């Protein structure tokens, strides 16, 4: 049986790079101390859109263009486009259909948008891989993850405003008779923090009738102890390893949610993975939400941490709370 492998991966981020000092001053002026938070999260810099021309869609297009060029492919070579975002620039038409136009896709191309919040791109990767296994018409797929959170962040909320960054990732998946690719995946859903992040705060129906004041179309966030994510991750990953017969020491790169460095290290330790295997990019990129595990994968590939045939573990968690763990052979 053919495997579905990652043929290529590329990323895009805006040129505007912001260090911690900007946010420290911003919150100092409001009487809010964030130095401890930034240190705990492992933040140093992040990239942020600072113009009206860029958004989640344009970042996704840049990442897609980069990966197509890198692979020596054109839009017409792609059989499926999946665009993952929780801040889609458009709801109608879908961003994947717009992407189809931008890359000059073929008439046969399947176009789907995916929103599973911060697990979106990882879930899309898993779901598209399985769809490719079942549908011989799909030889190559383009999976894109891109979020632009800044326009929807409360400037008095340090977790979102100082913790997040803008970036997009794109991967080309390809059917390969000699590859393993996706090995297995597991999901876990626990709605104990169902409404801790809500956007739009009152739902789309009320937004359409009541409107919202400029600068107030923001995520409504209620802080919670995110260490609960660690236990969910550990349970999922241990189950995945047991079901797939995978030894922790065989994992060459752990590409986890980049929200919190302590959580990354804690999960790695609890599942028996050496901390050197855990990839961290949140110090440079901040938390890029849906794309963050694949920004980490890009670093692992570009630095030579992993080679073809190595096993890679993904884990991330999304609003609600839902988490996903995926293991692949790169």
Predicted regions and their residues:
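Claisen-condensing/thiolase-fold acyl-transfer catalytic domains that form or cleave C-C bonds
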Residues: 57, 61, 87-88, 106, ...
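Acidic, glycine-rich active-site loops and adjacent beta-strand->loop/helix elements
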Residues: 12, 84-89, 116-119, 145-150, ...
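Conserved beta-ketoacyl condensing-enzyme motif
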Residues: 6, 52-116, 236, 240-264, ...
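Condensing-enzyme catalytic core mediating Claisen C-C bond formation in acyl metabolism
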Residues: 1-53, 157-227, 235, 330
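Acidic-glycine-rich active-site phosphate/pyrophosphate-binding loop
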Residues: 30-39, 90-104, 143-149, 204, ...
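A glycine- and small-aliphatic-rich helix-loop capping segment at beta-alpha/alpha-beta transitions
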Residues: 23-26, 94-106, 129-134, 157-163, ...
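Flexible, glycine-rich active-site loops centered on histidine and acidic residues
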Residues: 133-167
């Amino acid at each position: 049986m053919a495997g579905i492998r990652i043929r290529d991966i590329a990323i895009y981020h805006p040129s505007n790079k912001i260090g911690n000092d900007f946010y420290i001053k911003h919150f100092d002026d409001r009487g809010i101390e964030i130095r401890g938070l930034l240190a705990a999260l492992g933040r140093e810099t992040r990239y942020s859109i600072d113009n009206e021309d860029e958004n989640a869609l344009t970042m996704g297009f840049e990442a897609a263009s980069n990966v197509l060029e890198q692979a020596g492919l054109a839009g017409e070579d792609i059989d499926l486009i999946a665009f993952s975002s929780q801040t889609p620039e458009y709801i109608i038409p879908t961003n994947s259909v717009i992407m189809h136009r931008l890359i000059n896709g073929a008439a046969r191309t399947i176009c789907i948008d995916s929103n599973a919040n911060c697990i979106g791109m990882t879930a899309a990767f898993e779901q598209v891989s399985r769809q490719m296994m079942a549908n011989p018409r799909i030889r190559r797929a383009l999976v894109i993850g891109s979020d632009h959170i800044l326009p929807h962040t409360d400037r008095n909320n340090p977790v979102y405003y100082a913790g997040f960054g803008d970036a997009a990732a794109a991967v080309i998946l390809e059917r390969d008779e000699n590859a393993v690719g996706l090995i297995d995946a597991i999901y876990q859903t626990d709605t104990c923090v169902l409404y801790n992040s809500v956007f739009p705060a009152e739902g789309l129906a009320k937004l359409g009738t009541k409107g919202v004041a400029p600068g107030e179309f923001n995520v409504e966030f209620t802080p919670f102890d995110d260490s609960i994510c660690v236990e969910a991750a550990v349970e999922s990953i241990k189950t995945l390893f047991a079901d797939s017969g995978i030894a922790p020491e065989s994992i060459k790169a752990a590409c986890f949610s980049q929200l919190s460095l302590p959580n990354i290290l804690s999960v790695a330790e609890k599942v028996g993975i050496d901390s050197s295997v855990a990839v961290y990019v949140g110090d440079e990129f901040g938390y890029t939400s849906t794309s963050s595990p694949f920004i980490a994968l890009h670093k692992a590939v570009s630095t030579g941490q992993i080679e073809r045939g190595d096993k890679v573990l993904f884990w991330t968690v999304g609003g609600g709370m839902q988490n996903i763990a995926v293991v692949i052979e790169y």
